[in-house]
């Protein structure tokens, strides 16, 4: 499983999302800025599929 995460500096939920990905041992590539299809950060895709922000990522990983 590989993820991409769009973040900006000093974003607390971006930091939490990266920590969550680390906790679940999900390899990820970090991209700075906003995803063109999403207006908030963080924004996460896993294996090319949209997941959403921190809340959606938490739910996704808990349901693995």
PLM feature spans:
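Generic alpha-helical hydrophobic packing signal
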Residues: 3, 32, 39-41, 58-64
């Amino acid at each position: 499983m590989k993820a991409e995460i769009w973040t900006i500096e000093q974003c607390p939920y971006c930091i939490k999302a990266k920590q969550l990905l680390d906790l679940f041992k999900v390899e990820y590539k970090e991209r700075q800025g906003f995803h063109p299809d999403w207006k908030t950060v963080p924004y996460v895709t896993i294996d090319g599929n949209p997941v959403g922000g921190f809340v959606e990522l938490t739910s996704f990983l808990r349901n693995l």
